Amino acid sequence: NYKQNGGFEIFTKKDIDLFENCQLKLNEVNKLLKPLFSSSVFEIKDNAFGFKKIVDKLIFNPFEGQLDTGMMMEALLEKVKRKNIKILNNINVTSFLENNNSVEIVTENFSYGSSKLFIAANGFSNKLLNEKIIPARAQVLITKPIENLQIEGTFHLDRGYYYFRNIDNRILLGGGRNLDFKKEETDKFGLNDTIQSELELILKNIILPKNEFEIDYRWSGIMGVGTKKTAIVKSISDNVFCGIRLGGMGVAIGSIIGNELADEI
């Protein structure tokens, strides 16, 4: 269920200097990207969504899309089942030991052996590997259905620290990690009240200033980030490999990283 409704960069009025700097760079960036896309990637659009307290021009990218991640995971699980691959859920791997041509995988309750081990636990990987990766918790909420919602597409706010999109007639909004970096450097799921409150304020004051809305669900997710934006895809040894540090782009680049990881054998 992929929809290419485009992506929009939004700038609050306090960031008007940043918007103007980005606007000045558009031609340069489009020139760099044109060989890949055969047309300009970024253009200026009017604010047609009724957003408030923002610069009244948006930077639009027609190539960004929306994916139903639940349907994506369901399709991947079906594909795995057809190949008779067994999935063990909710098993906490604590360590691994290499034994010549095999790997012993140690969990909280039992151990088992495998000829190869691929580690793709992203933000949880620093429990097993000595790599430059930091867990980063992301706060998310989603509204109940909103009558006559006129917002369609994906949107980035405040240098990308906030992301929102429509899911049918709901708004999903996440981000705000920059409000509390240290507390959110964790692999423990949980809500941060400060950030969740800010997400609601952004909904009320910027995204949906004319709409009544209620929050339906709140949750958190764990990303894997680092000082570099590139993912780590490499062999740790002859039998152990990793594909980690996806930098908050897991849905977008996860399948590519999976292919690269498979090619490591």
For each feature predicted by the language model, list its residue ranges:
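Flavin (FAD/FMN) cofactor-binding and adjacent substrate-gating region
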Residues: 1-75
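Short loop/edge segments at beta-strand edges and connector loops
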Residues: 4, 89-91, 217
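Glycine-rich nucleotide phosphate-binding loop and flanking beta-alpha elements
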Residues: 16, 124-126, 179
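A short, glycine/Asx- and small/polar-enriched loop/turn
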Residues: 49-55, 97-104, 225-230, 236-237
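Helical element adjacent to the flavin cofactor pocket in flavoenzyme catalytic cores
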Residues: 54-115
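C-terminal catalytic lobe of FAD-dependent flavoproteins
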Residues: 57, 63, 209-265
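Flavin-dependent oxidoreductases
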Residues: 95-172
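Active-site lid/adjacent beta-loop-alpha segment flanking the redox-cofactor pocket in flavoenzymes
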Residues: 149-237
